[in-house]
Amino acid sequence: KTTQKKQTQKKAFSPKMLVYENLKNENVLKHFNNRFAQLDTLLNHPIWVQSPVINLGLNRQHTADIRNTDSLYWAKTAHEQLAIARHNGLEVTGQVYARPDAYFDADNDDAEQVSQYKAKTQAELGWNIINSKFYQGKEKKAKVALANELSRLQSKKRLTADIYEKAAEELTEQYNFYIGTIIAHRLDNLDIMNEAYQFMLEKDRISNDKMLKVMNEKLAAEYDISILCSDRDISNKPIYRMKPTRILVDTTALWHHIDQESIDARIVMVKEQIADNDSKLANYLSTTRITPFARWSSYWQSNNKISNNGDIGVRFTIPIYNENPRKRKALETEKEIIRSSRCTDVKEIKQSVGILLKRIENLNQAIATEAFHIDQTGKYIDMRRFAYKNQKQGYNYLMRMDEYTGLLESMERMYKLMLNRGLAIINIEKAVSIYDNNTIFREIEL
């Protein structure tokens, strides 16, 4: 079981220091020739791959969470608006009370005019029209809808906050694999050059500084691989060739998204709508209470008779102050604060996005330059291959290996440039809250 477990584990990269003793010239040259043949085969038959593209968007868990949260907010809004729709303003009040002493003693002639009863029952049906659906019902429904929409958007922003980090991590992991395989091939070249320099050092045909330079390059390459592909086996991999591309950005659509379509923009719009709606609700009439009513009263008189009477009227409460103009001024000021804050945020976002767009354009140019260099170096190697074969008296094996290594280094640089460009795009998408596939960025082959 232990053996099977070890076999199923991925083979990770581990650095090695090669020390050669008793080297022979023919063996060193054989290693060079074998490596040249291997590189020619790998370069002439590469594995062409598309540049890794992360379709930034919501995964299944994100989608399920957001749909569930959205449905809850919409259900909450529906229930609250239904409650408002059922609020007709009708209210029933009543009272029952008794008088222990049903008679009043008095010495004047008006004593008989005093109402005399043992108990009283009173019921009243009133219509509180101001506090009902019939007065500003549309605005009252809008108030709960806007409050829930604001909470829904803020919740959605929290739920989608981590997709950018995950996208960057996935993009980096894919590029690291291709970069790591290129470095691994370059490391194989350095191992052979290290062997050659050790042989030459034994023969006193080279100074220590050249050998140290190769060893330092080897250590740096091993360090890079240990960082990029510490948990992946990249030995004996083909050479992955990536087609160079250029990123086109629809800046008009990008600025429109920032101003109108991003979650932050929609949150600001909802906040402004809330302030507008609150301004409509803040009026003098809404602070009054006007209640038409119909009242029925029954009296148990002191002579044990029952008398009834009905009343209709209007009960009202009118404040002698009016604070609503100040409230509306405060709400207008709040809207100005919201707009000012949004303008500042948009300005900062556009500045940072502008820097990233400039970086993308610079990376586009650098990638095109590196792609041209790769193409020219490949043609140079093809041309030199025939020249080396026709040289009867031999040639400089170290120089030829440097040519292959230079090509690999150029490919490595281009892949790193393309990775940095992809990360810059993700940073823009994060800054402007793009969380789904979009047409703002378009990738074309050079």
Spans of model-derived segments:
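Acidic, low-complexity, intrinsically disordered peripheral segments
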Residues: 1-29, 33-58, 63, 231, ...
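Amphipathic alpha-helical coiled-coil scaffold segments and their short linker/junction regions
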Residues: 20-22, 42-89, 208, 232-294, ...
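Amphipathic alpha-helical coiled-coil segments and their boundaries
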Residues: 25, 60-69, 130, 134-144, ...
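A subset of solvent-exposed loop/turn segments in beta-rich extracellular surface proteins, enriched
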Residues: 28-60, 97-154, 190-196, 212, ...
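Charged, solvent-exposed structural "stalk/scaffold" segments
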Residues: 31-32, 140, 144-151, 155-161, ...
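Leucine-rich amphipathic alpha-helices with coiled-coil/heptad-repeat character
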Residues: 43, 80, 89, 155-162, ...
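A glycine-/polar-enriched beta->alpha junction
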Residues: 61-66, 71-95, 99-143, 156-160, ...
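Intrinsically disordered, low-complexity segments enriched in Gly and acidic/Ser/Thr residues
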Residues: 269-279, 296-408
